[in-house]
Amino acid sequence: TFDRELRLDRLGFNVLRWKLTGRGTPAQSPLTLQGFIRSSPEQDRPDLQFQASHVSYAAKPWFPLWRKGAGHEISAGTLLLNPASRGRVSLASADPHALPRILLNFLAEEPDRRALREAIRITRRIFNSEPARPFIARELAPGKQAEGDEALDAWLRATVISAAHPTSTCAMGTDGNAVVDAQLRVRGIEGLRVADCSVMPRIIRGNTNAPAMMIGEKAADLVLGRTAST
């Protein structure tokens, strides 16, 4: 696994090699496997993004007598696409320097919990099948003792984190709650547009990098007065 390459002497060599040649371990993706899957046959499109990595998520640089390595561990995680649970960002006060109130509201809706429980079970089936089975000694987390819905929900609530693709906090729309209009203009403020994924009414079922670029391109056209025909 990749943990071997995190030993400080090897890590330093690998970083230098990458800097000089553009090759080596740092040039590789940390994800060995990635795929879009459905949590149930009722889903008409994938609602989960499965990822596997050839290193422990908890791995850190190590060296004998300083810090012990993570060992020969692999990790798998699943992103919930287009979750039903919705968070909220609101102002704490009229002071523009005050930090906003942020409510992530993860796992508030049962469909989200159900999909992620199934994601754990799908992951177990993947690693208990050939050809992975001979290389797996045991499951470290959530552990074989976590079987029922209640146990899996408890583990999910303790470990779930953001996939760093936040959207929709300045959603476009025509209703009173919409922050921007169809031209990306902030309602009630002259000369201000928003040009990022916060204008999406809902998150897409995938990564947000490409949509963010397209929103930026569209915003540039709107500012310059360009239309599709020109």
Language-model segments: which ranges?
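Short, glycine/acidic-rich hinge or "gate" loops at secondary-structure transitions
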Residues: 133-144, 230
